[in-house]
Structures are given as C-alpha cells and as structure tokens.
Regions:
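Switch II (G3) loop of P-loop NTPases
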Residues: 1-42, 47
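Conserved Switch II/interswitch segment of TRAFAC-class P-loop GTPases
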Residues: 23-37, 50-71
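Short glycine-/polar-rich loops that comprise or flank the Walker A/P-loop
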Residues: 49-54, 78-82
C-alpha cells in the first residue's frame, strides 16, 4: 500500500482519468473507498458534467445510517443524484434449508432506496483472489446468485439513468 496525501492522490486520479484511453464508453463505474475525502471530491468535481448518479455500497452494521447521511449530504453538496444503495455481504444462504443467515446483522432503516442485497459468496471471493472475476461472471451468468443480482442491478441502473431497457 502507498500512503499518499491529498495533492498526490488528486494528481494520480486526474492522471488516470485524463491519460487513459478509455475507448468508447457507455458508462464508467468508479469504485471509491468509503468516505467523502479527496478521492470522491476529485472524481465528482472532474466528472461532474457527465456524472449520472451515485450508488452507495454499504455493508450491514450499526453505523450505516450515519454513513448514508454523510453520503447523501456529500451528494447534495456536489450536485449529484443518489440512485440508491447496494447492500454488500448482506447474507449467506444456508445450503441445507436456504434460510438467509445475516452474519453482520440487519441493516435497519436507511433513507435511501435499497437497489439490491448481495450475498457473501465463497466462490466469488476465490475468483477475485485468483484474478478470474470476468471468467467467473461469464461462466455463472445463470447459475450464481451474486452474478444474477449484479446483472439485475445493472439493468435497474440503466433504466434509471437512461429510461430504457438493456
């Protein structure tokens, strides 16, 4: 890991955005660390003219309501629409009875639409660790719950920002 202060982070992000040949994109999804620091400020400031919305990715826990409030305030300040929230690592499905087990507890009430709840998935984690996420998703498009939910989420977001089906 590299510990960079604000100006170095900002320059690295701007270099990545401006010096990369992205080709023709319909969408650019940017995965940011939690919080409203330099990374989020730089991305939203630079991409503001084309920013279609923000999706909050949360994990269940007691501090979630506080995190959502901060993120909504940040979105308001930068003039971005919060499209909704995705709850990551929300549950494990029991292989014996299909009951949903929530190892991190329930989410509780948040003032943002929940777009999707994603399960903990050991096969997915293994694919990520081995650098095989794309192959995993392609090979499991119909069989894996996490993959199905990601594709469903993608369709929901396209409908929201474009008003059309994929």
């Amino acid at each position: 890991p590299i510990a960079w202060r604000g100006p170095l982070k900002t320059k690295a992000i701007l270099d990545l955005i401006t010096l990369t040949n992205w080709g023709l994109l319909d969408y650019l999804v940017v995965d940011l660390p939690p919080g409203t620091g330099d990374e989020a400020l730089t991305i939203t400031r630079y991409l503001k003219p084309k920013l279609r919305g923000i999706v909050l990715v949360l994990t269940p826990g007691k501090m979630v309501a506080h995190v959502v409030t901060k993120a909504k305030n940040f979105a308001y300040i930068v003039g971005a629409k919060v499209l909704g929230a995705v709850i990551n690592m929300s549950y494990i499905k029991c292989p014996c009875c299909n009951a949903l087990l929530r190892p991190f507890g329930s989410l509780g009430h948040i003032d943002v639409e929940i777009l999707e709840e994603l399960p903990l998935d050991g096969d997915l984690a293994k694919a990520v660790d081995e650098g095989n996420l794309a192959d995993f998703m392609i090979n499991n498009i119909n069989g894996n719950e996490w993959v199905r939910k990601i594709f469903s989420l993608t369709k929901k977001l396209v409908r929201e920002v474009e008003g059309k089906e994929l």
